[in-house]
């Protein structure tokens, strides 16, 4: 029996993690958490009977307490609640599926408590990779990637030494606007943007996929996860989303991980690593697979990717500015307050005005995030 705690159980990754647990009797969900999705939380609590439920919003937490008064699940709230969940002695692995920089402190708390981390929260490594990876090494815990591309690389390098790796090739679908011009992007709507051709994901990450910011964030993460120089990380557009990523070794051999676009596969791989388990669902049928094609990403039109790489090269607090600016810009876009291309402009201007901190600690990272938010709010 493996006990898992989930940060962000009501979102896309969280619900798919619960689906994996639902179909594996030796996975026990001991904790769930959400922002304020009380109805979903109640359903999850009544199905999985966790010991603990953490709700970020205090009013929602009181509502949940009333709803589940007939159960044995303890309800906690706020950051203290998330930290209690992350460090609870009953769990062995912490799934960080929470969106945003709110996930950094609980992830650190989980590491200090000796929990392996099934990492789906991008912000953790993008903004605090220089803090997280040494901490994981110090406490002897594994950072297990849940993102499909990083999981693909993780699987491809299993059993290999880092010195044997020459290049990481991260694949991208290209999103719903692949092939569009800048002029065409001026007219796209929120509804257009949320129609991803291959993956079913949350709203924010779907927008990030359309801007190629998501791929930029994955490059930034890969740098820390696999201890690779940015010059040895390449993005390749693979429109069918069949090859999830590849690794080129120093002898020229390339290992690729292929599969149908199903997020449950990397989730389950992280939960059972280093072992594999049966997973239901579609399988690749090579007799029906007509083509696997590759393209070079259009970095002039889709500026999110080159700006992410620039932020990662500059390092220090610049990745935090990139991430915070994108997060708020996407929120404004989803609220239809700005246009699609304004996302790029907000990121670019935020990075341009920032005076970088070379080696920020966590408090400085969070302060830079708030400063970026305030600057954007004063102008858009």
Task: Annotate each predicted stretch with a short phrase.
Residues 1-380:
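Catalytic, metal-anchored helix/loop core of enzyme active sites in primary metabolism
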């Amino acid at each position: 029996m493996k006990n898992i705690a989930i940060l962000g159980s009501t979102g896309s990754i969280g619900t798919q993690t619960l689906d994996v647990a639902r179909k594996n009797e030796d996975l026990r969900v001991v904790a769930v958490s959400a922002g304020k999705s009380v109805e979903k939380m109640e359903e999850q609590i009544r199905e999985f009977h966790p010991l603990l439920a953490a709700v970020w919003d205090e009013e929602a937490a009181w509502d949940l307490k009333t709803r589940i008064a007939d159960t044995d699940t303890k309800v906690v709230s706020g950051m203290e609640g998330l930290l209690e969940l992350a460090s609870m002695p009953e769990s062995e692995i912490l799934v960080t599926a929470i969106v945003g920089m709110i996930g950094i402190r609980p992830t650190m708390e989980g590491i200090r408590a000796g929990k392996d981390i099934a990492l789906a929260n991008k912000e953790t490594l993008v903004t605090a990779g220089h803090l997280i990876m040494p901490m994981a090494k110090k406490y002897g815990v594994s950072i297990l990637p849940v993102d499909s591309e990083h999981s693909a690389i993780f699987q491809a390098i299993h059993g290999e030494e880092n010195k044997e790796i020459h290049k990481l090739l991260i694949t991208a679908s290209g999103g719903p606007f692949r092939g569009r011009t800048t002029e065409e992007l001026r007219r796209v709507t929120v509804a257009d943007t949320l129609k991803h051709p291959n993956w079913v994901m949350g709203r924010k990450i779907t927008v990030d996929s359309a801007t190629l910011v998501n791929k930029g964030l994955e490059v930034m993460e890969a740098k820390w996860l696999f201890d690779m120089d940015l010059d040895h990380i390449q993005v390749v557009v693979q429109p069918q989303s069949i090859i999830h990523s590849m690794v080129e070794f120093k002898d020229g051999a390339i290992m690729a991980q292929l599969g149908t676009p199903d997020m449950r596969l990397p989730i389950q791989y992280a939960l059972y690593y280093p072992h594999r388990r049966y997973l239901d669902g579609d399988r690749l049928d090579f007799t029906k697979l007509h083509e696997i094609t590759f393209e070079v990403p259009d970095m002039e039109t889709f500026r999110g990717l080159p700006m992410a790489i620039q932020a990662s090269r500059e390092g220090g607090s610049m990745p935090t500015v990139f991430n915070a600016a994108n997060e708020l810009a996407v929120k404004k876009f989803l609220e239809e307050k700005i246009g699609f291309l304004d996302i790029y402009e907000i990121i670019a201007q935020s990075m341009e005005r920032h005076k970088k901190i070379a080696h920020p600690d966590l408090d400085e990272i969070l302060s830079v995030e708030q400063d970026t938010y305030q600057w954007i709010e004063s102008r858009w």
